[in-house]
Structure formats: C-alpha cells, structure tokens
C-alpha cells in the first residue's frame, strides 16, 4: 500500500465523497465521485497530481447532470462520456425498485468537452437505458464509437459521431427479462460490466 487519501480530507477540500472510477491523464489522475460531502448527487471528479496529492475538483461545471458513475474519454476527439447511477444516500441503504420510477436512478449518458471540462450534450435513454453503468470507448484513439451497459434495462447502448460531426446513439443489444414468482416484474439481465477486446472487434 503506497498511500491513503482519507475521505475526510477529500470532503473538506472538494466537497466530494463516494469514489468510483479511476483514470489517468498524462501525468495526473481523475476519479469519479458519486456524491458531495453529505452523500447527495451529482458529485463530481477528484483531481490528483502524479504523487497522489489532491489538486481539487477536475470539472469546471457539472451542468445539469443529476448523477455520476463511470467515465471514459477520447482526447483526439475532445470528448469524455459519463454515465449515471444514483446518489450515495439512495444506493447505500440498498436497492429499491420503486426509486427507479421516482427518478432517483439515472437514465442518461453525457458527453463532455474534455478541454473545457464541462458537459456539452446528453443522450436521454428513457426506458431503454435504465441505470446506465460502465462506459467504454474503442481502444483505437481515432475512433468515436463507444458503448454502455444499461443495467436494469439489460441493454447495450452504442454511440458514435456521424459524417456530419453529430453524436448519435442507438440500442444494439436487448437481453430478455425472465419471469420470477418473487418479483413484481420480470427479472432483468442486469448488465453490470462490459469489456471490449483490445482489437475492438468483440464486446463481452
């Protein structure tokens, strides 16, 4: 164990809590944080230097984003994609299906201006994208294609930039739900993790 960054220090310096995804920049690190110091959404992004010291918050604005979760970026296209889960105060007590209908869980994917560090476009996925979790861009740094697994909808969402330079999205995989006597609705496939092969040919 090299270093511990105490949650109390993060809260005091950035008003953030509930770390999730860690990604490296050229010589620095950003971590998605799902809540503020009191566990309310949307949280933000913790920025660390190469020695794991806190710089502050990475983003300049969260815009209208209601929730945070995973993120990934393609710097050559000046874009970052982020997904949504829920506020720590919502998911920490345990999952309640009714809270999805009360809009306490996410259903959007956000595209960011990576240089400006602020969101610029949102895909509202609706019922096709309930609780979109892991996001992946192609490993090819020139590609604009990305994917996200929507856990509760049990769907795979695909996005890309078209020939006109506009971002588009579509549902490409829909896993059937299965009936269960103890559930009020058919049990979804719950796609919790997705993975792209290193040659970008296969999605797992």
Predicted regions and their residues:
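Structural signature of WD-repeat beta-propeller blades
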Residues: 20, 69, 133, 144, ...
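WD40 beta-propeller blade core
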Residues: 30, 46, 81, 110, ...
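Short, conserved, GDST-rich strand-edge loop motifs in beta-rich repeat architectures
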Residues: 32-41, 83-104, 159
């Amino acid at each position: 164990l090299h270093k511990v960054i105490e949650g109390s220090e993060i809260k005091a310096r950035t008003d953030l809590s509930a770390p999730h995804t860690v990604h490296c920049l050229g010589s620095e690190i950003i971590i998605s944080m799902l809540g503020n110091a009191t566990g309310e959404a949307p949280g933000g992004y913790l920025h660390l230097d190469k020695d794991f010291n806190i710089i502050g918050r990475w983003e300049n604005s969260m815009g209208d984003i209601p929730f945070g979760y995973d993120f990934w970026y393609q710097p050559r296209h000046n874009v970052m994609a982020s997904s949504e889960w829920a506020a720590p105060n919502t998911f920490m007590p345990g999952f309640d299906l009714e809270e999805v209908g009360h809009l306490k869980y996410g259903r959007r994917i956000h595209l960011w201006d990576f240089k400006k560090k602020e969101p610029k476009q949102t895909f509202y996925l609706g019922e096709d994208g309930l609780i979109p979790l892991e996001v992946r861009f192609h490993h090819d740094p020139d590609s604009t294609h990305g994917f996200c697994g929507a856990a509760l909808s049990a769907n795979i969402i695909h996005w890309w930039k078209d020939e006109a330079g506009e971002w588009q999205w579509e549902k490409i995989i829909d896993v059937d739900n299965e009936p269960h006597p103890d559930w009020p609705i058919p049990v979804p496939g719950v796609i919790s993790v997705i993975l792209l092969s290193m040659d970008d040919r296969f999605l797992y």
